[in-house]
Regions:
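TRNA-recognition modules of translation machinery and tRNA-sensing kinases, especially anticodon-binding
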Residues: 1-231
Length: 232
């Protein structure tokens, strides 16, 4: 084959020697999912771009900079999926799987983001995910934690991984933090890069994701969310 035909940057092959390990990991995870009552669902690699704009957020780096989007022959904007949750939810709604019923579903497959390839981060990467719908209360969240712990244990990862649990607080707490954070950032508006200025009017909290050095310096003294969250 002509040497100029190579895999695209950040999109790697999996040869037979690596595939056996890959299949072992998948099978163990799928077995654990099944033991907790989760069923597999499959959905397309390509979805309407608007689906991800709505679910992930128009002002996020994923939507603005990282998605592989293009127009099809009908002029519709479509995108390779950058994550699995949006497609899973869309499939459930479209197929009537959420009407007056609970669902436990899992999926796996390639996702795509045009990031800078580096160790542990590729432009085509594989995601295994589990979603639960229609369960009231926090019990299902606890079950997810137990399921994750079981996966780590079966793959001998418990000693090398740490689980950190985050919270964005209640709606009132979050709104109060957004107001305080926005007031703080506005004091430095003239020092913000163009992306951050845009986010200031559309979704101020996205500024926290900025990799701009100057913005990072401003954020160093910004109010932090945990100060506005009251856990009981």
């Amino acid at each position: 084959m002509n040497k100029k035909f190579q895999s695209l940057r950040g999109m790697n092959d999996i040869d037979p020697s690596g595939l056996s390990t890959w299949k072992f990991i998948e099978s163990r995870i799928f077995e654990i999912f099944a033991s907790y009552g989760y069923q597999e669902i499959r959905f397309p690699l390509i979805e309407s771009t608007d689906l991800f704009k709505r679910s992930v957020g128009e002002s996020t780096d994923i939507v603005e900079k990282e998605m592989y989007s293009f127009e099809d022959r009908n002029g519709d904007s479509v995108s390779l999926r950058p994550e699995g949750t949006a497609g899973c939810v869309r499939a459930c709604i479209q197929n009537g799987l959420l009407h007056n019923q609970t669902q436990k579903l899992f999926y796996s497959g390639p996702m795509f983001r045009r990031e800078r390839p580096q160790k542990g981060r590729q432009r085509q990467f594989f995601q295994i995910g589990a979603e639960a719908f229609g369960f009231p209360g926090p019990d299902i969240d606890v079950e997810m934690l137990f399921m994750t712990s079981a996966i780590w244990s079966h793959l001998n990862l418990s000693e090398v991984l740490t689980l950190n649990i985050n919270t964005i607080g209640s709606l009132d707490e979050r709104n109060k933090y957004i107001e305080t954070f926005t007031d703080y950032i506005k004091r430095y508006e003239s020092d913000l890069d163009d992306d951050s200025k845009k986010r200031l009017t559309r979704n101020p909290l996205r500024i926290l994701d900025s990799k701009n050095v100057k913005v990072q310096e401003i954020l160093a003294d910004a109010p932090i969310p945990v100060s506005y969250t009251h856990l009981t």
